[in-house]
């Protein structure tokens, strides 16, 4: 999954973490690895994140916060920043989507949207 906005491209890869999940207790742990590419000619800094997480029962949760994994990275032109985080769902299927608030070298804010991506245990969907 990939989203391109302005000079920023966001790629997402997900993984079900079976060893830390407990389906009998409705606990499904997923990791997601995000790569943010700066395709522009100026530095960009990730300031804030916003996630909307929905499980297959329609339960929604929102996450707002400063930076990602404790950092507010500045990404140089033609470079990327990669991190891994995770979320727990009560169902074996869900979706996440959101956005990053970025700041360019002029101090102007812009949103880098993150298209919806699926969180699913292996073999659930074809």
Curated annotation (Swiss-Prot):
Which SUPFAM superfamilies does the UniProt entry name for this protein? ApaG-like
Q: Which domain of life is it from?
A: Bacteria
The ApaG domain extends over 2-126
Alphabetical list of PROSITE patterns matching this protein:
APAG
- Supply the InterPro entries for this chain: ApaG-like, ApaG_domain, ApaG_sf, Uncharacterised_ApaG
Pfam families documented for this protein: DUF525
TM regions (residue ranges): none
Annotated PANTHER family:
OS05G0170800 PROTEIN (PTHR47191:SF2)
Q: Could you tell me what this protein is called?
A: Protein ApaG
| Organism the protein comes from | Shewanella halifaxensis (strain HAW-EB4)
Question: In the record, what lineage is assigned to the organism producing the protein?
Answer: Bacteria, Pseudomonadati, Pseudomonadota, Gammaproteobacteria, Alteromonadales
**Gene name of this polypeptide:** apaG
